[in-house]
A protein has these predicted regions:
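Short beta->alpha connector loops
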Residues: 36, 102-105
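Active-site loop/oxyanion-hole signature of alpha/beta-hydrolase fold enzymes
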Residues: 11, 51, 61-98, 102
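Conserved HGGG/HGGXW glycine-rich cap/lid loop of the alpha/beta-hydrolase fold
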Residues: 21-66
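N-terminal low-complexity, intrinsically disordered patches enriched in charged
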Residues: 43-44, 72-75, 112
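Short, hydrophobic alpha-helix immediately C-terminal to the catalytic nucleophile
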Residues: 43, 85, 108-109
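Alpha/beta-hydrolase fold catalytic core
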Residues: 1-29, 51-54, 92-94
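Short glycine-enriched nucleophile-adjacent loop
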Residues: 104-112
């Protein structure tokens, strides 16, 4: 399944790059990678999940992959969490959050 490259606005206006797959009307699943990785870490998983009828979003976290680096050098858990919430708010419906390592911690903080 072909992915569409999408740029989301993160916390503090950062541009965060993602690959989006699947039906735009389906429930979104937001995949967040670990530190030092990129959105491609979730690529094959996202393809499998999208083929099951979900809309998948694999995101490059701030300072990773094709996403912006934070000009104020804020790479705190608070900032990663705020980016997660900002992207989730742009998806049209609440996403399922899936994360590993840094992405997992960010997802848990976003869920409260």
């Amino acid at each position: 399944m072909e992915a569409e490259r999408v740029v989301f606005e993160g916390f503090e206006g950062l541009h965060l790059v993602a690959d989006v797959r699947g039906d735009p009307e389906a429930t979104p699943v937001l995949f967040l990678h670990g530190g030092g990785q990129t959105r491609y870490a979730w690529g094959s998983t996202a393809e499998t999940v999208a083929a099951q009828g979900w809309r998948t979003v694999t995101l490059d976290l701030r300072g990773h992959g094709d996403s912006d680096w934070a000009p104020n050098q804020d790479y705190s858990f608070t900032a990663f969490c705020a980016d997660c919430v900002a992207v989730a708010d742009q998806l049209g419906q609440p996403p399922v959050l899936v994360g590993a390592s840094l992405g997992g911690m960010s997802a848990m903080l976003a869920e409260g």
